[in-house]
Amino acid sequence: MLNYKKWTQPPNSLIKSIKASRAAYRRLGNSGLLVSNPILGGMHIGDPRWYDWVLDEKDSIALLKAAYDRGINTWDTANIYSNGESERIMGRALRSHNIPRSKVVIMTKCFRAVTDPDVDGDIGSSTAFFPDLTRQSKDYVNHCGLSRASVFQQVEASLRRLNTDYIDVLHIHRFDHHVPPEETMKALHDLVQMNKVRYLGASSMWAHEFAILQHTAEKNNWTKFVSMQNHYNLLYREEEREMIKYCNLTGVGLIPWGPLAAGKLARPPDGKASTFRAINGGAYKDHNPAESEQIARRVHQIAVSRGVPMSHVALAWLNKRVVSPVIGLSSVERMDEVLDARALELSDEEESRLEDPYKAQPPQGHS
């Protein structure tokens, strides 16, 4: 007869593991997959020759190990980050620290072209950001976009760089206007059936484009997207008009990028930016700088009154509305700061103060 009293207390090893897990874990949309909050953004992982704010391999691997040790088990990257070096370093981090593959959720993306080192040896090359030109090149045709040929080629290349058999969540980086939705969604579905990809997601596009792709998958009984990685923070809320409503209604998990607006929501408005990326405000133009400064000042005021960093206030507002933000971290100190943000809850009055100055602006980042 079994002695069930033996199992009335959890083992010490489990308690120890929970104490070390400083991240929270949340369901990704209607899927059963749990992802960490926060998600570690991989754009900072790679080679500083691509952008000056990117960490080199040694510092990148140290950061990834620190993330794993703290329970940040979800790592987001893309094939184009540091022209593939971000993916390679993530794979090396797993091997060098003997991290079991099954204990990390790896997200990557396909759509843009990765610079071919046999064509251009400069890792800082920006081939990815000229999609119309890459379609005219003998070296890049069928190596970008979302055709069946391109999707398969890009995923196989990512698997080699990551040195893994599967990708946990594959995001399409943008919508492809040159390829029928049926071709893209069938290719993605087949990758899932082949167990090379386990879940599908999408990033930054118009809500109607995302709905078209989801409907295409649904009517054909193909794999649907479980996540949307869109641009969303206190300074850019245009996604609230359509995309966020659609995702919430249909069970798609929101994992936004740029949660701290390239650092604008993490330092006082009069503070000095420390990187080229922060100095130039990130990838997109701020159409309402006066309103953005007012919001940032209010974030700072609430942070001072609460005795916490500004990032805690910005993330407390966002975490209430999404599954998990994708955050690019440049140091272990910043990582610990972000992890400590879990404890803060804003009052309704504080949230209203943060939201009131916002002014509508043209949508950005969908192409």
Curated annotation (Swiss-Prot):
It comes from Alternaria alternata. Keywords: NADP, Oxidoreductase, Virulence. Pfam families: Aldo_ket_red. It is an enzyme of class 1 (oxidoreductase). The lineage of its organism: Eukaryota, Fungi, Dikarya, Ascomycota, Pezizomycotina. Gene clusters encoding host-selective toxins (HSTs) are localized on conditionally dispensable chromosomes (CDCs), also called supernumerary chromosomes, where they are present in multiple copies. The CDCs are not essential for saprophytic growth but controls host-selective pathogenicity. GO terms for molecular function: oxidoreductase activity. The active site is at Y81 (proton donor). Its EC number is 1.1.1.-. Aldo-keto reductase; part of the gene clusters that mediate the biosynthesis of AM-toxins, host-selective toxins (HSTs) causing Alternaria blotch on apple, a worldwide distributed disease. AM-toxins are cyclic depsipeptides containing the 3 residues 2-hydroxy-isovaleric acid (2-HIV), dehydroalanine, L-alanine which are common for all 3 AM-toxins I to III. The fourth precursor is L-alpha-amino-methoxyphenyl-valeric acid (L-Amv) for AM-toxin I, L-alpha-amino-phenyl-valeric acid (L-Apv) for AM-toxin II, and L-alpha-amino-hydroxyphenyl-valeric acid (L-Ahv) for AM-toxin III. Substrate binds at H173. InterPro entries: AKR_Detox_Biosynth, NADP_OxRdtase_dom, NADP_OxRdtase_dom_sf. Pathway: Mycotoxin biosynthesis. Belongs to the aldo/keto reductase family. The keyword Oxidoreductase applies. The keyword Ribosomal protein does not apply. This is Aldo-keto reductase AMT2. Residues 346-367 are annotated as: Disordered. NADP(+) binds at residues 76, 203-204, 229, 258-268, 330-338. The gene is AMT2.
